[in-house]
From Swiss-Prot:
Compartment(s) of residence: Mitochondrion inner membrane
BP GO terms, sorted: mitochondrial protein quality control; mitochondrial respiratory chain complex I assembly; protein insertion into mitochondrial inner membrane from matrix
Top-rank lineage group of the source organism: Eukaryota
Organism: Pongo abelii (Sumatran orangutan)
Topology feature Mitochondrial matrix, residues: 1-34, 79-107, 177-196
Gene that this sequence comes from: TMEM126A
Record's protein name: Transmembrane protein 126A
Keywords of the record: Membrane, Mitochondrion, Mitochondrion inner membrane, Transmembrane, Transmembrane helix
Quaternary context: Interacts with OXA1L; promoting cotranslational quality control in mitochondria.
Function recorded in the entry: Protein required for the cotranslational protein quality control in the inner membrane of the mitochondria. Associates with newly synthesized polypeptides and may act as a chaperone that cooperates with OXA1L for the insertion of newly synthesized mitochondrial proteins into the inner membrane. Required for the assembly of the ND4 module of mitochondrial complex I.
Membrane topology label: Multi-pass membrane protein
GO terms under cellular component: mitochondrial inner membrane; mitochondrion
UniProt topological domain (Mitochondrial intermembrane) ranges: 56-57, 129-159
Family of the protein in this entry: Belongs to the TMEM126 family.
């Protein structure tokens, strides 16, 4: 039991040291390191709004713009922001993620799956429900639902290829920059300590 306490104390000292060094960075760099997930979340919200617009055009949905637009912006934003914080920002700031390649891979995958593909898949039931409610498009019968949605989604995925790739590259780049800023912060000397 005592060994467990000493490990926690050592880990807490490490987290305190890392946060103290991060606070020594200039404000712009510190903001990028601490709030980078918000930028990825904003890009995901934009992907959600674009996918929503494309599905609305295909399904001829003209009503409930705000009712469909708000969840298509907020849900991808919050999901991407929280996921990026949990799997990239927090492990970087606690010292659990100490490999640049791992950071780039994690942040790129979050950008691709959560920030790019998830908003497009989320737009399908939102706009499908609106099309059924307002009867703006002929929806399939029970037998061919899957083939209908695959056929309907293909042009949307083609048009969303660029925003999804942009989101992936931006997220990977942001992860790389955050890792470099963390390394820069860790190399700063303590203000009260002298190096001999």
């Amino acid at each position: 039991m005592e060994n467990h306490k000493s490990n926690n104390t050592k880990e807490n000292i490490t987290i305190v040291d890392i946060s103290r060094k991060i606070n020594q960075l200039p404000e712009a760099e510190r903001n990028l390191l601490e709030h980078g997930s918000v930028y990825v979340g904003l890009n995901a919200a934009l992907c959600g709004l674009i996918a929503n617009s494309l599905f609305r055009r295909i399904l001829n949905v003209t009503k409930a713009r705000i009712a469909a637009g708000l969840p298509m912006a907020w849900i991808p934003f919050l999901t991407t922001d929280i996921t990026y914080r949990c799997f990239v920002s927090f492990p970087l700031n606690t010292g659990d993620l100490d490999c640049e390649t791992c950071t780039i891979t994690r942040s790129g995958l979050i950008g691709l799956v959560i920030g790019g593909l998830y908003p497009v898949f989320l737009a399908i039931p939102v706009n499908g429900g609106l099309a059924a409610r307002y009867q703006s498009a002929l929806l399939p019968h029970k037998g061919n639902i899957l083939s209908y949605w695959i056929r309907t989604s293909k042009p949307v995925f083609r048009k969303m290829l660029f925003p999804i790739m942009l989101q992936t590259m931006f997220s990977a780049y942001l992860g790389s920059e955050q890792y470099k800023l963390l390394i820069k912060a860790l190399q700063l000397s303590e203000p009260g300590k002298e190096i001999h």
